[in-house]
């Protein structure tokens, strides 16, 4: 059975939504640039040999609608190349990598593009979830309960299923973070400390040249070249973030200092069979060892990485002790903290270059972006096995184990 290997990775800088460096770029234009950048790194590959372009997008509507994956293929002059657009919210472009893995293992293709994009700045043109009166009234009581809790103080989380009630599948992500923090006993100070850690580590990694290794500069319509992420801030201190006000509840724990911002960005991987890579004389960057995906209550979605990671590790025949570096997507410190603790991940292996609290989390981009970052990190720190994992809106988790090959 062939192995699935990653032979190229590229990502854009990550812009802040609505006010950042990429706010003028359409999602299709940005994706096409980054897919082309990934292909340019492997000129040995004939584009006619690509079997499918699979694009992850968290909210594929508006400018990101119309089956954006296919739009991008045609835009790039590849009418022969099929394209699909996949949403699994925050893990959309990890899902596309999983699909490439499965297709290669099944013998149904040798070369796939796994890409991801989100341009929240452009969401004013519409998103897949933005239409009024589209929620199923079946969940109206659950939504009302969420709204009531959001306005109250001292609320703890209790699984509504235990009372024979439905959970709220439409719940805002910030409310799930508040629920999980209370359920797992995570304090505001711990969350702030983690947020500061992310920013400080990102600042150090920037100084060492780590992040610039994986970023493909993007040229804007006016000719401006963007080559850095907007999010990292130098000199962030615990004292500086301690005064930030809670965002989601009167007595909330989540602030702008301990969660990710809203962002724009795109990333792309070229995944092929090891036999095809050998045929082309390519040295793979990494091998996809295994993946995992899990579900749990939508109201505590942030805990999803735990079960998904256990799945992926079991399928890989590895334990957490075998993993050299771990990237947990930092949607909220409130979810990273209980996840890494319950997976027994040492902090000196976790998000060692900073994470999404600093660099950002464009939903559909994140899966492929973290894969690119993990490969970069395994190379930079000379390590072998990496685990990528994230929580997913709607109450899910996803994970992937990779092995560095070069």
How should each PLM-predicted stretch be described?
Residues 1-58, 62-72, 76, 176-188, ...:
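Conserved active-site "lid/cap" helical segment
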Residues 1-27, 149-156, 163, 239-303, ...:
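Condensing-enzyme catalytic core mediating Claisen C-C bond formation in acyl metabolism
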Residues 11-13, 24-33, 44, 152-154, ...:
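N-terminal extracellular/periplasmic Venus flytrap/periplasmic-binding protein-like
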Residues 25, 57-112, 168-171, 238-261, ...:
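Conserved catalytic cysteine-centered active-site region
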Residues 47-55, 84-88, 112-116, 190-197, ...:
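Beta-strand segments within the central parallel beta-sheet cores of soluble alpha/beta enzyme folds
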Residues 55, 175-178, 216, 221, ...:
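Active-site pocket-lining segment
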Residues 111-179:
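Flexible glycine-/small-residue-enriched beta->alpha junction loops
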